Amino acid sequence: MAKRGGKRTVGVPYRFHVTPGIFMNSLVPVADNSGAKLVRVIGVVGHYSKSVHRRIPGAGVGDMVVVVVREGKPELRKQIFRAIVVRQRRPYRRPDGTWVAFEDNAVVIVTPEGDPKGSEIHGPVAMEATLRWPTIANLASIVV
């Protein structure tokens, strides 16, 4: 007989389905004071790129992506980091039925464990990102 109930992963108590709005090779501004200004998405953590019909990996709010710094401090440029998507232009639907869309796309540079490299986040942060990554919620000034 099949097991009842879904699997829960440790460290990710909230996992909402968010419509992907940021894809491979997207140029995305950085919303923290880590020194990077513009990054290019080169991968999505947890997404196998050669899966369904070679589909291009996409990330939504709250997802971790692999990025390379394109503009910013010289010591950060051409370096590969991980980042969390905190805003996206693409509208997505919340479980209560409301639709959310931001004015711009934005990411926050983090360590591989998920701790932010900067000490402050500029602009609003989506609720889905703060529920999934509590350390980002501590730095967020506005949560939408």
From Swiss-Prot:
Presence of keyword Isomerase: no
SUPFAM superfamilies: Ribosomal protein L14 (SSF50193)
Entry-linked CDD domains: Ribosomal_uL14
Keywords per UniProt: Ribonucleoprotein, Ribosomal protein, RNA-binding, rRNA-binding
Coiled coil segments of this chain: none
Pfam families: Ribosomal_L14
GO terms for cellular component: cytosolic large ribosomal subunit
Molecular-function annotations in GO: large ribosomal subunit rRNA binding; structural constituent of ribosome
GO biological process, one term: translation
Stored InterPro entries: Ribosomal_uL14, Ribosomal_uL14_arc, Ribosomal_uL14_CS, Ribosomal_uL14_sf
Top-level division of the source organism's lineage: Archaea
Similarity comment: Belongs to the universal ribosomal protein uL14 family.
Subunit structure: Part of the 50S ribosomal subunit. Forms a cluster with proteins L3 and L24e, part of which may contact the 16S rRNA in 2 intersubunit bridges.
Function: Binds to 23S rRNA. Forms part of two intersubunit bridges in the 70S ribosome.
Entry protein name: Large ribosomal subunit protein uL14
